[in-house]
Amino acid sequence: MDFFSEYGDANRYKIQEVIGKGSYGVVCSAIDQHTGDKVAIKKIHNIFEHLSDAARILREIKLLRLLRHPDIVEIKHIMLPPSRRDFKDIYVVFELMDTDLHQVIKANDDLTKEHHQFFLYQMLRALKYIHTANVYHRDLKPKNILANANCKLKICDFGLARVAFNDTPTTVFWTDYVATRWYRAPELCGSFFTKYSPAIDIWSIGCIFAEILTGKPLFPGKNVVHQLDLMTDLLGTPSMDTVTRIRNEKARRYLSSMRKKQPVPFSERFPKADPAALKLLQRLLAFDPKDRPTAEEALADPYFKGLAKAEREPSCQPITKMEFEFERRKVTKEDVKELIFREILEYHPQLLKDYMNGTEKTNFLYPSALDNFRRQFANLEENGGKNGDAVPSDRKHVSLPRTTTVHSAPIPPKDHQNITSQVPQRIPGRTGRGACPVIPFENLSAMGPYNQRRVVRNPVLPPATTNLSAYAYHRKSDSSERELQQELEKDRMRYQPSEHFMDAKVVSHMSHDLRASSYYVSKAKSDVADRAALQSNMMQGIGPFNGIAAVGGNYNKVSTVQYGVSRMY
């Protein structure tokens, strides 16, 4: 039956090789055999061993669902666990990126001014979207910005991010703040509590941009004192008014007693950089956070003249408080497990529909395909990260579900209202495509009713995926098999996805017109000739940005960037 084959995604992906390992688990590259796309599958194991780790994972997958933007890494799918109550690992499918910005900087000592400009533009455009949602990343650094050889950047790793609400306390404790010191704003030096402010991310972007310009970190401090010394060596000693806003007493006392230092002209520190770039950099690295521009203000800087365009730099509506109610309450591991399961259902529309309607029976058949998928991961690790011989299946028909049924129970009732029973406004998960946009908002329709990247949140249920799978959802029904088939067919037709976007593939010897608006609407049944003409028009480069996407354009100063080892997601 189609219903039973809709959710078994383990057979959908063919594992290629290990591209990253860490304390959290393993990342493998894979092929989506339904679409042919290359993806990265992150296995996160024992996620409920520590409550803080589970909350971080929940925070990240929730934010990546809510923040759909071309310059933010996309979760394409999360595999359905074998049961609602007993799962310990999750498999998260990301779009595959070649490397990260740290490796790009390390492997390239000849990045051009066009590279510099385009890199900063993408980072600020993503930051504008993030900040207008009232989200602060708090851990921006080159390793947390994924990159492709065609110069496409995407921000990732939202595990330390926070959402600010109007009624949150003015001072927020950052006991988990462990971000790299080199990219930490001066007001955070030595502090584990501060006021939420988008200026902390702006400072980090300034440090990253300076590193792009020079090829090495700007403030590689060995400790807090050394970090402050490096900052003041370049920027000069801050005013007493600025010093009083430093929350750490030792840092404040040290800056107050510091000998007077004059700022170093940025033209001396960065002699080869574009003067317009240095003017903007100086604003990004203002010692006083109130003097730093917002991401939107930075995008309007003259440095981006001819490149920036307001219609392809969207804002995001603020995230609703209900989405992050778990951050404001004391929750148990079982609470977080239920919330993570709820997030996973965003990528399984039919199950989510039953869950939201209260008709979900919480009975899942354990598909043997997931066992086979786990063996593929284990086989890769045993073979040093390379795919050896195919792992044989235990049974001939591995796509068929096992006969055993795992029953799960709901979270026991508590004195307080269960936070998982509240239905927040949501952005549905996207089963997605694999092509990384090179021009702003490639493949994006501003009008599609089921477009999860719309600026305005869409409370309508997402279209059910048309991809086949072998996950089985066991549901009891008094109706006959024929009536059930008709009901399922009716549901599938109701949520049939429409084409609201158009592929714009990158081809050799062409680059994109970055000054053209990339918002466009394509009908579900567009004429083939019209589609081809539109694609051709959007892939024609116009100087001086011809070749800025680094896909072999005619602009001979821009080339495909080199990169080192692929990073972990």
From Swiss-Prot:
The modification Phosphotyrosine is found at Y177. Pfam families: Pkinase. Its EC number is 2.7.11.24. Residues 13-304 form the Protein kinase domain. Residues 404-432 are annotated as: Disordered. The keyword ATP-binding applies. The active site is at D139. Expressed in leaves and panicles. SMART domains: S_TKc. ATP binds at I19, G20, K21, G22, S23, Y24, G25, V26, V27, K42. The keyword Cytoplasm does not apply. Dually phosphorylated on Thr-175 and Tyr-177, which activates the enzyme. GO terms for molecular function: ATP binding; MAP kinase activity; protein serine kinase activity; protein serine/threonine kinase activity. The modification Phosphothreonine is found at T175. Activated by threonine and tyrosine phosphorylation. SUPFAM superfamilies: Protein kinase-like (PK-like). Induction: By heavy metals, abscisic acid (ABA) and infection with rice blast fungus (M.grisea). Down-regulated by high temperature and UV-C. GO terms for biological process: intracellular signal transduction. A motif (TXY) lies at residues 175-177. It is an enzyme of class 2 (transferase). GO terms for cellular component: cytoplasm; nucleus. The TXY motif contains the threonine and tyrosine residues whose phosphorylation activates the MAP kinases. Belongs to the protein kinase superfamily. CMGC Ser/Thr protein kinase family. MAP kinase subfamily. This is Mitogen-activated protein kinase 8. It comes from Oryza sativa subsp. japonica. The gene is MPK8.
